[in-house]
Amino acid sequence: MTDRWDPSIPEHKHLAHQIEIGNGIPEMRPIQKARDALVNVGFEILHEEDLAERPDEVPWYYPLEGDVFKAQTVWDIFTCWRTSSSGKFVSHHGLKLLETFGVVPKGTWDVCETLKIAGDALVKTGQQKLFTPMYLVISKKPLEG
């Protein structure tokens, strides 16, 4: 979670929880904890950057938004459509039908619903810059001397 994430704000905490549940992550931690951990074990941080903050016309979460107009390639059109309202409707109801007839294992639809929660939370936190999958840190461990 970025430095903008504040666990005292209920919406922020709820969105982090949705990411945790949907992606099987035990606990989302803020970037500051990563910084502190590096320093505590003796690393010197040479450079750190949230690459998602760089100016780009298309955000990292675009495939999860469901906006086919942000597609970068022909295959992206299908990828983006799957997360659109109509794509979610077709895929989730189609999957429920396949599960009903035993084509896919029981519980597949439930997993899909959980992933949908995570995807929606990733989009919201990406738009609000509360979460980043693109935190870059370059550090070095000083030589003992």
List each model region and its residues.
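Conserved beta-strand signature within the Rossmann-like core of class I S-adenosyl-L-methionine
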Residues: 1-4
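Substrate-binding/catalytic lobe of Class I Rossmann-like enzymes that use SAM or dcSAM, i.e.
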Residues: 8-134, 138-145
